[in-house]
Amino acid sequence: MKTVILAEKPSQAKAYADSFSKATRKDGYFEIQDRLFPGETVITYGFGHLVELDSPDMYDEKWKQWSLAHLPIFPNQYHYHVPKDKKKQFNVVKRQLQSADTVVIATDSDREGELIAWSIIQQAGADQGKTFKRLWINSLEKEAIYQGFQQLRDAEETYPKFEEAQARQIADWLIGMNGSPLYSLLLQQKGIPGSFSLGRVQTPTLYMIYQLQEKIRNFQKEPYFEGKAHVITQNGAFDAKLDPNETRAT
């Protein structure tokens, strides 16, 4: 029986390997020997996302050229691909996953970690006929890692987080792939050259920066007053200043 542990990145895989009795580094993975996993066990890893959503032109050649007539872009199904610079590592991971009896998802314990893991597993065609477990920890200390592997969860418990993350990923794709050409083409019609990138997080953040810059640019100096007092008590005298942030109604 073979167990494959899927980490998110090389440094994470190394931390896992160091927590076991013996680990041997190979090309793109580690071979593990430990009483916790008596059978053949390997740790392999991604480089973060090994799989990306296809660009519009990969669905239809007409979407390669921006045109208002081609908007909106809504594929019937969403497809993924492995970027060229990540194919070597993906193929390493794919071979390990396909030969596994049990897969332990050990990416980061959050939605994005679920997305990274299941995107790789599904793209590798290794999402059926296997036992899936989930490592869920918040520390890379050796003791915490080992304890986490002793208390693996069923992967189905956290699978909804993958679905949430994938929905967010597709929504971001739709906003970017439709909003960017739409606003760029409309601005070009008004004589403003160039292309403009829109994003769910990027655009509101940019607007917040703009608002702050406008406040700085339009700032007007105004006179203000400070309340000060020289206080004399039986124990001595001292100067005091009113702090408006410390005043309280009584």
Regions found by a protein language model. Name each.
Residues 168, 172-248:
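Prokaryote-biased recognition of long, low-complexity C-terminal linker/tail segments
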Residues 1-169, 173, 177, 243-244, ...:
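Intrinsically disordered, low-complexity regulatory segments
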